[in-house]
Amino acid sequence: MTDIAESTAHPRDGVPPSQQTTASVASAALATATASASPTTGSATSTAAPGKRSRSSSTGSAKGSIGGKKATRACDQCRKRKIKCDYDNDKNVCSSCNRNGDRCQFNRVQLKRGPSKGFNRNNSTSSAAGASTTSSTHQTFNANASGNTNSSNNNNHNNNNNNSVLLPPITQYFQGNEQNHDQQFWKVPVDLAGHLSPHHSQSHLHRDSVDSATSNNSNLNINGINIVDNSTTNSQSGGYFPVSACRSRASSVPSFPRKPPMQIQPPMTSMYASSLGGGTPATGAIGASNTAVSGATVPGTSSKRRKSVVSSNESPRTSRASLLPRPDFAVVNLVPVPQNVVTPASSLPAVPSGPLPSTGVGVGGSTGQVRLTDLDLINTYYEFVHLNFPVIPINKKALTSDILVINTSIEELNDLVIVWFRNSLELLVTVSLEQPQTQSTHAYTESLNSCFQNVVNLYPRLKQNNGIDPKVKIVYLCTFLILIYVLFFLGQHNSFIISVSVTIFNNFGLYGKLLSLNTSSPDSSSPYDIIFVRLYLLLVTFDSSYSMALGTPKLLNLEINGLVDKFFNLKSQNEHLFIDENLIKVNCILKNLELGEYICNASHMKDSSDAMKVIKSTYMSKKHQSKKADHSSSVSPMFISEWFQKFLVDKKNLISLLLDYQLRINDITPLQLSKLYVDLTNSLCALITVILEILKLMMKLNPTNSIDYNYRPLQHFDIDKPPSGGGGSSSTNTSSNPYSNPNSNEFYQKLLGLSSDRNTNLADMTRGCITPFAIITINELFNVTELIKNIPSSLISVVMESTKEEKENTINPQDLVLKLSNSMNEIVQITSLLTMVKPYKGIDSSYPRWQKFSKRSGPIPSMAPSNTATSTIQDFSEYNMTRSPSLGSSAYSNNPHSQHSDHNFNETNDYNDNISIFKKIYYENNNIQNNTTPQNEVLQSYIDTAWRLLDDSELGWL
């Protein structure tokens, strides 16, 4: 009787009590009568505890309450609403379902959770007794139990010694019969929990809900794009899937996980908390997607990784709520583009039109902003960054469908590489967004240093794994280049980042790949090797630019003549090797990279400690003219990079022109002097014109060097019509996209003629794009302008006097005076533009030294009477460049009493006289007395300007 009553205590799964068979009801009634006769036995056997049930061998056995009693479990509708259920057999419906017009159903299959009641691991007797009374699917084994020698217990004993639970692949539950369609859940034996550690027991048995075999929560659809989790099993973390099963479920699409484990968190990560305040949860669309992902239990991921407390400081704008999920990155399905087909930029996936909110938690702790998704970060990079300097030297399709598809056996390490790649890219986008300068650059510097430290910490683990996927190495090395880009973008002086990056690049053997591929055809080489060579060439460009900007020796003293065109402009049929899918953009990228190639070649003398060798071989020899310089001077520039390259060439020619007369200044003839002044006028006017063109383009395209979603690059180009004018413009009308930069001043736009031209120029492709060389460019333009701005007014009187004394006057002095007058007008415009072009970030940025130069701007010597020549030269000698010792070059100043509050230490005078460093070295080697008065003092003053320009070129621009 007891067994019968116990078997009928609960309703059958999926069958309401009203549908029980007559025989079952009769048996239940008999059990009730027996219970009434024997209250002690009946009360212990016939009443089932709420929420518990006994499994019956018969599928048709009835479970539930009888005799008008309430059911012992809530119906599915009430359980879903989480309300109390008062189901009654007489009505066959509860009050809640009756009000809502629903029908009570009991289809949900409930699993037991946790160990069995009263289970004691140390009690071998209880374990043995439990093993004899439990079904075969719930067998348990205790190593100390005796008398149990069957084969199944031996197998369980072996599994217990291995301290692991291996279940068959989940795919075996997908059979074609109807019975398996009703049973959609896979189960872990409850009694096996005693043989698992408490940590594993909680992670595998005490989950929020059971794992459905047919509903794979790792396959989500965010923003209409299919993304799949690429987790694999970590055998050391107690995963409950076999390794082979997890690998079969591995994804073929990339992901940007945001949750590295706790073991890779150096102390420097704590700097984010104080400087960036990333404790506010992200809101908006990404928050919704994170909520969807966070509900998924990814097989093969240990509970230790799921439960680890991840610091919110891993990214400068990553909140704790946004770090816990693992949002995936999707494949962007782009149509393959043949080499001879130009794909308009409008057909590429891009960020939706209109302004986008800034990313994450703002720098300094400002909240209320929406974090950019992974796809938005990629689109932002390729729209605003890639065109001026491809720090990720592949096109968007190759990045999203190949390089970021990473899933190897070292799954945890791969996740960390992707995490810091994403954080570095987000840092770049964060610091470049258009925003008010209310924060200190210290916050950005702390973020950069912390991110770089975490990336460097991954290097030993990557280096010791010889079989690591080349794609992981590419992503890892790209992360270094992105951080160096941020370093240049902020104008920071930190040679540690570049030096460590050079060391890691060399240890990965990239120099050997460059030597190997340079002697063979790149088309026949491995695509990954070509990408490695591109990364190395970009690092050489950064190193050379840093050397020129700070006046320090190069770390990679390589000549890369012709290598940019060889490795970045491949004629290969492999579309993944294209630097961009739009051929017009490819041309723009190559032009910008050629600037780095020229800077690399111009800084090749930084390996010499002999200053005289630098002076004589580089600036005092007319034979030393690079082919690149001759070529660039004959081609009309279009882009800022080409104009700046021409500026460097013209500056070098001006220095060489004047220094060539240093030795024979006392032996020069009047005819030679007249010719010198003509050449000086032409060279000086050309240099001033180039400076103005660069500043006008910077003002027109992106005066703040920031990303502004309201001021995007042009998306359509008409390449059928030939270019017109000196700027290579095409006649595509851009009335829908006028040159009305919201950040610029309308008055100066009209004054400079920037608002009247409505025709598209090829240089306007880079409108709104950022560049890493904006700060060093504006500083160099400022330095040269301050040194030469007074020379045109002085040359006017000099030219007039020299042409009068010449008997055979073949030069019209009015033409020279007109040129010099126009240059004086251009100097005024340059001075105005230098105050408006502000690529600096942060309120404490190192702006050009306006006051330092203005205090030393003395009059240029002119054709003055002999009694005033000495005083004039003295005034002009005070016009000297002041250099900051924090920039890696020797500090020297003309005013020993000057105090500079923008540095942490005082500047000192290396020399007592008011001459340049290179001039002093030259005078000492040639036994020339500095206090000797030259016969032509005016010419000597111009040569002194050339010496100071030489100091600027060789000792740093910043």
Curated annotation (Swiss-Prot):
Q: Family membership, please give it.
A: Belongs to the EDS1/RGT1 family.
Source species, domain of life = Eukaryota
Against SMART domains, the record matches this protein to: GAL4
- Biased amino acid composition, Polar residues: 884-898
Compartments annotated for it: namely: Nucleus; Cytoplasm
Enumerate the GO terms in the molecular function aspect.
Answer: DNA binding; DNA-binding transcription factor activity, RNA polymerase II-specific; zinc ion binding
Q: Which Pfam families match?
A: Zn_clus (PF00172)
To which species is this protein native? Vanderwaltozyma polyspora (strain ATCC 22028 / DSM 70294 / BCRC 21397 / CBS 2163 / NBRC 10782 / NRRL Y-8283 / UCD 57-17)
**Name of the encoding gene:** RGT1
Which intervals carry biased composition (Low complexity)?
21-64, 124-164, 730-740
Q: Where along the sequence lies the DNA-binding region?
A: 75-104
GO cellular component term of the entry, any: cytoplasm
Q: Keyword check for Ubl conjugation, yes or no.
A: no
The protein's UniProt keywords, in alphabetical order, are:
Activator, Cytoplasm, DNA-binding, Metal-binding, Nucleus, Repressor, Transcription, Transcription regulation, Zinc
Q: What's this protein's function? A: Glucose-responsive transcription factor that regulates expression of several glucose transporter (HXT) genes in response to glucose. In the absence of glucose, it functions as a transcriptional repressor, whereas high concentrations of glucose cause it to function as a transcriptional activator. In cells growing on low levels of glucose, has a neutral role, neither repressing nor activating transcription.
The protein's name is: Glucose transport transcription regulator RGT1
Region annotation (Disordered) maps to 1-73, 113-165, 197-218, 291-322, 720-740, 884-908
